[in-house]
Amino acid sequence: MVTLDLHGYGWMLWRGLGLTILVGLGAMALAVTFGLLGAWGKLSRYRAARWLADTYTTVIRGVPELILILLVYYGVPTLIQDLAASAGHDLRVDLNPFVAGIATIGLIYGAFATEVFRGAFQAVPRGQIEAARAFGMGRALMLRRIVLPQMWRFALPGLGNVWMVLIKATALISVIQLEELMRSADIAARATRLPFTFFFAASLFYLGITIVSMVIQGRIESWSYRGAQRG
């Protein structure tokens, strides 16, 4: 009979849930950073910056996420060790799976956030920017007073979608032995031979994260539009 504590493994799923949320939040922060840099690059007047941003988004969106995770976790340390060996140094490099997971997921979804921010920047009315220039606003002041407040408002729906996909993608880092929700469910399923029970429980946890995220996103969007609605 399935008990409420999931045969003694309920604590493991809750711990895995906490780790999944931590990885998701860290990766989202990194994705926003990469996204802002990528959007700046795509909209830059410098050809090199545009080329780097285009290359980044094309490569990341063209390579399967699982391959990128394995490449970062297993490939990067091996590459560093080989380079050190060729220079005559005996070096051992081990990546922390938690750090590797955040870095890789953040890098991947930064490419998608790049397009979100690019569209948000372009959605800011040009007339307002030209009016700010006519009033003698400097670039920094115009960015802070005119562009960024509106850009974030336009970007919020897209960033919410990025978060929804990102948090589910954290399940992929179970392949690098990080005991997040998916890995914890797999361990419990193998130990008890009850795969349906634990994978179904994990799916409910993911669904719960999604529902809570949708509620929070809706409230943030409503708050961000208060000024526009009053205007």
List where the protein language model places each region:
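Transmembrane alpha-helices and adjacent helix-loop boundaries
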Residues: 1-231
